[in-house]
Amino acid sequence: VELKNIFKTPCIRHNQTSRNTIRKVALCGGSGSFLVRTAIKDKADILITADIKYHEFFNEKIILADVGHYESEIFSTELIASIITKKFPTFAFSFSDNNTNPVNYL
């Protein structure tokens, strides 16, 4: 439920939630399923990303959470703005309120 609130999405596809404690999180905006092996190697308990394929959800070594492609990338603009503002304090940003996500949920 917390992930749904953080990523402002009505649903999250995931494989398992049986682990009591999540100590290490791997996060990739956009299509990050190619990082499953790396996340396991780095001992992540969960990989939060998008565009995870059906058969990848059978992996029992890590929790996979697919929050949606758009939803996983939406915060990158704020992060980039924060980084640029630290380097260039007088740089002005204007963020659009337009939702460009072509995916809708019922």
PLM regions with names:
Residues 1-106:
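Active-site catalytic microenvironments in core metabolic enzymes, especially phosphate/sugar-handling
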